[in-house]
């Protein structure tokens, strides 16, 4: 079995999406992904929860970045955050929360405060050591989310299970 990462975006009516999800290619006779990969995805989801739980009107992207990294590391994770606004281009105007090459803060865009009624690509990864493969992998996730007065929510939900490739039962509806 292999772990597959897909990063894609769609532009429609001048608005952009940005999404990353993970899939697992089943070995012959497998019907589900190995537990160690399911657990790795759970760690990625927990990092998402840490970060989005820190969203607060007026808090800057750099403050959210710093707190997310601190809390994530305290919990034993190896997070990397690079969340950005979505809009009429992929990395749109507004509050930026980290960049892949700027985990100590983002000058200017990271200093913008969070505002309600804004949409973000919740983009991040966490590194997880997989004993069975004797290597570290990055659980890379990205989903659209909106920050409103009622709090944060994912626009269309988020990935919480690996997509299974080669599972004919799912494909055929059995």
PLM features: residue spans?
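Active-site neighborhoods and metal-handling regions in enzymes and metal-associated proteins
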Residues: 2-174
């Amino acid at each position: 079995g292999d772990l597959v990462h897909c990063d894609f975006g769609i532009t429609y009516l001048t608005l952009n999406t940005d999404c990353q999800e993970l899939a697992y290619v089943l070995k012959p006779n497998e019907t589900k992904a190995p537990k160690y990969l399911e657990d790795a995805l759970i760690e990625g989801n927990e990092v998402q929860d840490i970060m989005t739980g820190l969203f607060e009107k007026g808090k800057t992207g750099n403050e959210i970045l710093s707190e997310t990294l601190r809390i994530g590391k305290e919990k034993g994770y190896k997070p990397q955050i690079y969340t950005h606004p979505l809009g009429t281009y992929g990395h749109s105007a507004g509050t930026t929360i980290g960049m892949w090459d700027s985990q100590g803060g983002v000058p200017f865009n990271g200093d913008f405060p969070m505002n309600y009624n804004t949409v973000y690509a919740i983009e991040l990864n966490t590194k997880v050591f997989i004993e069975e493969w004797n290597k570290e992998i990055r659980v890379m996730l990205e989903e659209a989310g909106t920050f409103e007065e009622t709090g944060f929510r994912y626009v269309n939900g988020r990935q919480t299970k690996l997509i299974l490739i080669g599972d004919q039962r799912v494909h055929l509806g059995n």
